[in-house]
């Protein structure tokens, strides 16, 4: 079997693709893969480290206002379609899977015109412009949230989940917290503002930790940008560990009791696979406010609390955290509700979808 995967720009498009690739390798080790990304996307750093054959296209996104930039965007898109067709004819994949980002638009569209079976994976509750465009041309649409179903043709769509979930679903608590100077036996709150950090979250966490004196622990990944600043402001405390970044995030999540962070699709897939209660702070800077919709899918099922970015400060953060961390019954209820929202066999579902499409 030969599978071409395309998607990029952000980790939310890349990690689900890589998780699926890793799963297929366990099922069919002889499968050949190729990844096609954008020249300037994050995938340029991440994918080559996997050893997978990797090709890039020169492509960029649209701006909301009319501009010369958009004329160039159209030119690059048409050029990318031509380049994608060359790659596809050379590699001859049995199926092409797009996970979002502008590059997947060109590659999946090109594949559809060459009559190669195609699947797109939508990670969010509200689809992006690329997957909306591609939905008219692809054979199958894999959804991560039921809330995304109304945006796509029902006859093409299946609830699959996010393949990243299956990678973390079977993880148990480990001793990893000890590597951050914390007690693996104590209840722990993990606070994470995204790989780059988030100013509003950093300000609220700084206020919250200034007078922290609780029995539970806090592990905060601030992002490199804010690390030195918060280190100078927050007094040393045995129950608090501040790190610029956490490499083994999934393992740390599995060893935590509460997650505080943004409502990106990958984070939600991971925390629901683990049954981890959460306080979600949707980013106000994303397209179509999709993180709020992602968060609400858990809030309405009592699996998470939500604090709007403009309502976040040290006081609101402390109140939300202590409401959960001081109430064992609530914590257990939220954990169960979170687990019920998860799809821990997402990669298997995607694999079965791919096989059914190829054998059709």
Curated annotation (Swiss-Prot):
Pathway: Cell wall biogenesis; peptidoglycan biosynthesis. It is a peripheral membrane protein. It catalyses: Mur2Ac(oyl-L-Ala-gamma-D-Glu-L-Lys-D-Ala-D-Ala)-di-trans,octa-cis-undecaprenyl diphosphate + UDP-N-acetyl-alpha-D-glucosamine = beta-D-GlcNAc-(1->4)-Mur2Ac(oyl-L-Ala-gamma-D-Glu-L-Lys-D-Ala-D-Ala)-di-trans,octa-cis-undecaprenyl diphosphate + UDP + H(+). It is an enzyme of class 2 (transferase). GO terms for biological process: carbohydrate metabolic process; cell division; cell wall organization; lipid glycosylation; peptidoglycan biosynthetic process; regulation of cell shape. GO terms for molecular function: undecaprenyldiphospho-muramoylpentapeptide beta-N-acetylglucosaminyltransferase activity. One of its GO terms (cellular component) is plasma membrane. Its EC number is 2.4.1.227. Keywords: Cell cycle, Cell division, Cell membrane, Cell shape, Cell wall biogenesis/degradation, Glycosyltransferase, Membrane, Peptidoglycan synthesis, Transferase. It is found in: Cell membrane. It holds the Pfam family Glyco_transf_28. UDP-N-acetyl-alpha-D-glucosamine binds at residues 10-12, 124, 195, 246, 291. It comes from the Bacteria. Its main location: membrane. InterPro entries: GlcNAc_MurG, Glyco_trans_28_C, GlycoTrans_28_N. Belongs to the glycosyltransferase 28 family. MurG subfamily. Cell wall formation. Catalyzes the transfer of a GlcNAc subunit on undecaprenyl-pyrophosphoryl-MurNAc-pentapeptide (lipid intermediate I) to form undecaprenyl-pyrophosphoryl-MurNAc-(pentapeptide)GlcNAc (lipid intermediate II). This is UDP-N-acetylglucosamine--N-acetylmuramyl-(pentapeptide) pyrophosphoryl-undecaprenol N-acetylglucosamine transferase. It comes from Enterococcus hirae. The lineage of its organism: Bacteria, Bacillati, Bacillota, Bacilli, Lactobacillales.
């Amino acid at each position: 079997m030969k599978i071409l995967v395309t998607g990029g720009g952000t980790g939310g498009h890349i990690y689900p693709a890589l998780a699926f690739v890793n799963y297929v390798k366990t099922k069919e080790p002889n499968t050949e893969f190729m990844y096609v990304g954008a020249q300037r996307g994050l995938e340029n750093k991440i994918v080559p480290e996997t050893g997978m054959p990797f090709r890039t296209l020169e492509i960029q996104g649209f701006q909301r206002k009319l501009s010369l930039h958009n004329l160039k965007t159209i030119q690059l898109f048409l050029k990318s379609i031509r380049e994608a067709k060359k790659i596809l004819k050379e590699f001859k994949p049995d199926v092409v899977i797009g996970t979002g980002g502008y590059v997947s638009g060109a590659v999946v569209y090109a594949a559809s015109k060459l009559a190669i079976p195609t699947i797109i994976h939508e990670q969010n509750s509200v689809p992006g412009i690329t997957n909306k465009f591609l939905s008219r041309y692809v054979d199958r649409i894999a959804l991560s949230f039921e809330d995304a179903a109304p945006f796509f043709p029902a006859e093409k769509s299946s609830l699959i989940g996010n393949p990243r979930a299956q990678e973390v679903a079977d993880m148990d608590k480990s001793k990893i917290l000890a590597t951050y100077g914390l007690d693996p036996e104590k209840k722990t709150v993990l606070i994470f503002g995204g790989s780059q950090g988030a100013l509003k979250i950093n300000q609220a966490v700084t206020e919250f930790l200034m007078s922290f004196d609780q029995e539970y622990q806090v592990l905060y990944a601030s992002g490199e940008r804010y690390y030195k600043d918060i280190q100078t402001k927050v007094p040393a405390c045995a129950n608090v560990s501040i790190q610029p970044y956490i490499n083994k995030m999934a393992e740390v999540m599995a060893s935590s009791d509460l997650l505080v962070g943004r409502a990106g699709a990958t984070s939600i897939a991971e925390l629901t696979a683990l049954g981890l209660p959460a306080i979600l702070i949707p980013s106000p800077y994303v397209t179509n406010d999709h993180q709020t919709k992602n968060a609400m899918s858990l809030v309405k099922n009592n699996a998470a609390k939500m604090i709007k970015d403009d309502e976040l400060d040290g006081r609101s953060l402390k109140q939300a955290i202590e409401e959960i961390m001081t109430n064992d019954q609530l914590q257990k209820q939220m954990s169960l509700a979170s687990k019920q929202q998860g799809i821990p066999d997402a990669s298997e579902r995607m694999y079965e979808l791919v096989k059914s499409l190829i054998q059709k």
